[in-house]
Amino acid sequence: MRVEYSKTAVKALQRMDKPLRNHIRKAIEGLTLTPPKGDIKPLEGKPAGRYRLRVGGYRVIYRYGDDGSMVILYIIDIGPRGDIYK
């Protein structure tokens, strides 16, 4: 499985301090396992197929994709719980 980050997610990670960034990256690695590990829930509404991963007070918004030969984990956004859903 390949992991791809959106520009928004990369910027969010760059703004975080190193311990938090490492904690979130470790949680994202858990999503590549079968079955995925973590506090995961599907997001309601559109577009469908998006999920959220809870990492302390932060949320990781992601979806799975497929390029024909490999499953891709797209990290869409990362942010504090209060701001990420806006």
Range-by-range predicted roles:
Residues 2-3, 7-8, 19-22, 55-58, ...:
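Enriched for short, Lys/Arg-rich terminal
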Residues 11, 38, 82:
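Glycine-centered loop/turn positions within well-structured domains
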Residues 29-52:
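A short, surface-exposed loop/turn module that caps and links secondary-structure elements
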Residues 15:
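Small, basic N-terminal interaction modules of short regulatory proteins
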Residues 8-10, 46:
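Short strand-loop junctions, especially beta-strand C-caps/beta-turns
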